[in-house]
Structures are given as structure tokens and as C-alpha cells.
Regions:
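Bacterial N-terminal signal peptides that target proteins for export
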Residues: 2-11
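Bacterial N-terminal signal peptides
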Residues: 11-20
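Sec/Tat signal peptide C-region and signal peptidase I cleavage site
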Residues: 21-25
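Short, low-complexity N-terminal intrinsically disordered segments enriched in polar/charged residues
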Residues: 26-85, 197-201
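Surface-exposed, charged secondary-structure patches
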Residues: 28-29, 92-93, 97-156
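Short beta-strand edge/turn micro-motifs at domain boundaries
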Residues: 28-40, 162-192
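Hydrophobic pocket/interface hotspot
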Residues: 66, 83, 91, 144, ...
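Early exported N-terminus immediately downstream of N-terminal targeting peptides
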Residues: 75-80, 84-102
Length: 202
């Protein structure tokens, strides 16, 4: 996820994906900022938005929707209502990283994440892609370990960051929900283990 936990984050050079805090696994150089017309800030305290059935029909679909909704070129507003439609009431987004050698986390609501990360995602451009996933399911409870790459432009040759999203999901019998997204960026002293870089089976 884009991470509003650092002065420079996955979401912008200051995080999903932390944009105002100091937890950043890798600190990429601040990208040139696009000259955008004023974008509408994310709304808060809105009525729940009905999900697109295609977004919540399967585990694959809801994880794909999560990555898609935060991704886009510079100056393109993100659909935060769609983002909210993916998560349960009370969902949490939890970026983690290290400052002064100590692990630090920040627990956010979906609205807090949208407010913290939205401007940087939209100003700088941000594309996050899943490259590997492992998971387990018991009854209605599913845990997915989703490895990601982050780019400023969709066609950038190399990602500026990688990491793992630990995604907790629930299936209520009619649709899938995201309960928690807890993530950490890769660091030079903490590379992603090989078992979490295996491409998905076809």
C-alpha cells in the first residue's frame, strides 16, 4: 500500500501507500510533482457506498480492486467511494516501518488513509501491482500475504519500492470484505524472502 507514514512515502515522497509520519522502509528521491488543477479532497463521514458486485465476488477480485483503486497517473482523482465499498465498517489500515531501529505502526481508518495519502497519490502518480500471493482460509476468515511493487508511472521499468500487504478478508456468504491491511516496505536490511516472490500459478 501507499504509505503515509514517512516524510517520503510509497504514496508520495513524504505513506496505502506514511505521508506525514517517519516510518518508511526505503526513501526514494522526491519525484517531480505534476502541476495539477485543484483536486477534490476525499470526502469523509459519507453514507456507505454499494460495492460493484464484480469487485467483491471473489478473493482475487477484491484484492485486484484494492490495488486498482489506489493506482493511477498524476492528476487523476482516486475513487475513494469505491475504496470504502471494499472494506467492512471499522476496517483498519496499518502501515509499519522503522525509525531509529524501532518498529513503528500507525493504525488508520479508511477515511484517515484517504486523507493522509490521497493528495500524494494524485499529485505524483502511483501504481501498485501485486506480484505474488500466499494465503490461508478457515471458514469465513482468509489471510492473504500479498507482495507488491510500486511505480510512479505504469510503464516505469523498475519499481521505486516493494513490500508485503498482510490482508485480512471475510466472506459473509454474499460478498468479500477487507477487514485489515497491515503492510511493510522492503528495506536493504530486510529483503523480501524468496517464498514471497514466487509468481502466481496460472
Amino acid at each position: 500500500m501507499a504509505r503515509p507514514y514517512a516524510k517520503r512515502s510509497l504514496a508520495g515522497a513524504a505513506m496505502l501507500v506514511l505521508s506525514t509520519l517517519s516510518v518508511r522502509a526505503q526513501q526514494p528521491a522526491r519525484p517531480p510533482q505534476a502541476s495539477c488543477e485543484k483536486l477534490t479532497p476525499p470526502s469523509t463521514h459519507v453514507s456507505p457506498t454499494a460495492a460493484d458486485p464484480k469487485d467483491v465476488a471473489s478473493q482475487d477480485a477484491i484484492i485486484a480492486a484494492l490495488y486498482d483503486v489506489i493506482s493511477g497517473p498524476a492528476c487523476q482523482a482516486r475513487d475513494w467511494d469505491r475504496f470504502r465499498s471494499l472494506v467492512v465498517p471499522g476496517a483498519r489500515l496499518i502501515p509499519t516501518g522503522f525509525t531509529s531501529g524501532k518498529a513503528v505502526t500507525r493504525v488508520m481508518t479508511p477515511d484517515e488513509y484517504a486523507t493522509a495519502s490521497g493528495a500524494n497519490l494524485e499529485r505524483n502518480g502511483f501504481f501498485e501491482k501485486e506480484i505474488s500471493r500466499t494465503g490461508e482460509t478457515f471458514g469465513a476468515v482468509t489471510h492473504a500475504f500479498s507482495t507488491y511493487e510500486s511505480r510512479r508511472k505504469a510503464n516505469d521499468e523498475k519499481p521505486f519500492a516493494r513490500g508485503i500487504n498482510s490482508i485480512q478478508l471475510s466472506n459473509d456468504g454474499t460478498r468479500w470484505w477487507i477487514v485489515t491491511v497491515y503492510w511493510q516496505g522492503e528495506r536493504p536490511d530486510s529483503p523480501i524472502p524468496a517464498q514471497y516472490l514466487k509468481p502466481p500459478a496460472n
